[in-house]
């Protein structure tokens, strides 16, 4: 058990672990890169976008709402995480449940206040998003398949806020979003396989617990093949510059992923597959820069 009086630094590290600060930093980077190189109008330069006050407030509100979402999710999953993630849970518990809940409400309050400086619609949007995250943590995640789809949808919504702000509804953005959404659903299902022991012990009705590992693997396989649809569309119908190398490389990785998925049986093997999917997502964020190298140079000048 954590010490009775952990230092302030330990509590900060614990809170950073609870809110998964590393994930939030990647999301912030992804929102800004997508804004600069995909979503924002071409006439806006990189500096104009980077120092756009309303965009900054939207990204900040997104980060706070996501952080609060991780907190409430951690609160509801505390028992099964003792089995599934004992080391992380040990670190997380340097902050009490009471402090976590207080932080959850404070972050949500600040998020809504920040949104109010953008527009009333932003307040409605983020209020609905906060409620949706709570609903997912409290109810939806306990429903096989629907829980996985809900988690992936909630992960994509912050990007929706950005392209609504810039009023850019080009088809290419939705195709990119569909690819990301499918990979996120796959990742959620792999997490269920990875956490099978703890979920089973807590009678948590995930897809592998309810219908078995083979059914979960079959569902993941179908989703992997579905990811090839947006990839083909992006390669054939749109100009995505050197990012086509990313999608070709990702397709190869997903084929290898499928092979290892069907021979995997242990938690460590599923964790390796989970990390491979994380790599695909984070690498994809960085490869946004490859869509148009000329635009990258122009926007950064």
Feature names for model-found ranges:
Residues 289-301:
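Juxtamembrane boundary at the C-terminal end of a transmembrane helix
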Residues 26-34, 91, 149-166, 208-213, ...:
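Small-residue-rich segments of transmembrane alpha-helices in multi-pass membrane proteins
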Residues 19-27, 96-105, 146-151, 214-224, ...:
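Select subsegments of transmembrane alpha-helices in polytopic membrane proteins
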Residues 1-9:
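Short, membrane-interfacial amphipathic segments enriched in basic
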